[in-house]
């Protein structure tokens, strides 16, 4: 899968792309990441990419010309999505990550900055807007890296035991169950006996019940969705 990231700060991605599962996925050519700086496509000698908004207002906007030129310089694969990282976008979720990982061969991630981008970018270039939630960050690189990480780990061959992906939080609209490792007794806190019993049926029942109780308590929105989907 190919990722083209339109960013004013390519160095932001250097360390993450060399580390952990992302680095391994790139080494194995499961994914390819291309960093494109729109400043290289600016029209003036100062490589200016921002300007004041028409009608007045606080802050600066990213100009349309460098962004359009940066995206139009890319190789186009058949199944491509052009994503703008913006607080106005659809909140990111596990189903969205899975859709992006399965339905597309190329993701173009545009990192917003300042007060945002010229609306013509959104109207005539972008095919999807994504947000991390109801809050504002200083740059679009953090959301873009989140999407990159979330999608790549779902690609076949990235995670060693792909079965584990199906058991994670949100995959079935339930949060994950509590997990423990050795020692069985730490200070005065003991691992639940059922997990040490060797009774796999009892363990599965306990884990399912923990998922249900945890989701009801912590994420009533997910619990409502789960009850609707599961009768």
UniProtKB/Swiss-Prot annotation:
**GO CC terms in record:** cytosol
By its UniProt entry, which InterPro entries does this protein fall under? Alpha/beta_knot_MTases, tRNA_m1G_MeTrfase_C_sf, tRNA_m1G_MeTrfase_TrmD, tRNA_m1G_MTases_N, tRNA_MeTrfase_TRMD/TRM10
A GO term, aspect molecular function: tRNA (guanine(37)-N1)-methyltransferase activity
| SUPFAM superfamilies linked | alpha/beta knot
Per the UniProt entry, the Enzyme Commission number(s) are 2.1.1.228
- Choose any GO biological process term that the UniProt entry carries and state it: tRNA N1-guanine methylation
Name the reaction it catalyses: guanosine(37) in tRNA + S-adenosyl-L-methionine = N(1)-methylguanosine(37) in tRNA + S-adenosyl-L-homocysteine + H(+)
Give the keywords, sorted. Cytoplasm, Methyltransferase, S-adenosyl-L-methionine, Transferase, tRNA processing
Annotated S-adenosyl-L-methionine binding sites: 112, 132-137
> Where, subcellularly, is it found?
Cytoplasm
Top-level taxon in the UniProt lineage: Bacteria
- Please explain the role this protein plays, according to its UniProt record: Specifically methylates guanosine-37 in various tRNAs.
Would you identify the family this protein belongs to, as annotated?
A: Belongs to the RNA methyltransferase TrmD family.
Q: How does it assemble?
A: Homodimer.
Family matches, as NCBIfam families: PRK00026.1, trmD
Name of the protein this chain belongs to:
tRNA (guanine-N(1)-)-methyltransferase
Organism, scientific name: Gloeothece citriformis (strain PCC 7424)
Lineage, broadest ranks: Bacteria, Bacillati, Cyanobacteriota, Cyanophyceae, Oscillatoriophycideae
